[in-house]
Amino acid sequence: MQLPTNPIEMSYDYREVVMWLRKCGRKHLGKNFIIPENEKGIIFGMLAWFLQDELVAKEMNIDLTKGIMLSGPIGCGKTTLFKLMGKIPSKRKNFMMTSTRQIVSEFMQSGYEILEKYSRGSLYNDHRTPKNYCFDDLGSESASKYFGNDCNVMAEILLTRYDIFKEKGIITHLTTNLTAGEIETIYGNRLRSRMREMFNLFGYDESSWDKRR
C-alpha cells in the first residue's frame, strides 16, 4: 500500500497522530516504534480506517465498512500494529484480539460451541451479541479434530462471520503470513471469495525486515 502521491484533504493532522503513535509505541513496546519509508502507506491507511477519515479513505480506496486483512512476512509487525491501533481514542478500537492457535486449542477442548463463541457469540449468554474480532496469525493453527471429526475451525468461523457481516455489518480483522493462493488451498475458494467482500487488503512488502531482532 502506497501513500497518495498528490496532496489530499484530510480530517486530521496526521503528523500529530503519528507522533502520538510513536509515543504509544515506546510506552507499550518498551522501545522506539520505527516506521520504515516503505511502510508509511500501511500506517497511513490503518490510521485512516480507525479514525474513520472518509476523505483519506476515498483517496486510498479504503472501504470503511469492511475490516482489514493485514498480510506480510513473519516478524514484520502486523500484530504489534493492530495492538497499537487498539489504543487509538476511537470507537473503532473496540475489538478483541485472539490468536487462531488459541481458538483451535479451545475447540479441541470444548468442541463446536467455540465456533459459536467466535462468530455469533457465546451460547450461554441470553443476550448473544457478535463481537468485533481480530484473528491473529491466520494459518499458524494446526489441523483440528473433535471426537474424531475433522473441522477447519477458522474456515467455519470466518464463513459464519461473513454472514453476520452481510446481515449486521459486524467487523472482522485478520493478520496472516499467507498469500492469497495459500489461503485458497488451506481454507477453500468459497472463503477466499468472501474475504474480498469482508476485508480491505493491506500488505507489507516481502522485503520488510524482521522487527523482533
Please give the residue ranges for each predicted region:
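Walker A (P-loop) ATP-phosphate-binding motif of ABC ATPase nucleotide-binding domains
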Residues: 67
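Conserved glycine(s) of the Walker
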Residues: 75-81
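A short, basic N-terminal segment
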Residues: 1-63, 202, 209-213
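Walker B catalytic acidic pair
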Residues: 136-138
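AAA+/P-loop NTPase substrate/partner-engagement loops
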Residues: 87-133
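Hydrophobic anchor at the beta1->P-loop junction of P-loop NTPases
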Residues: 70
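Active-site signature of alpha/beta-hydrolase-fold catalytic machinery across serine-
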Residues: 84
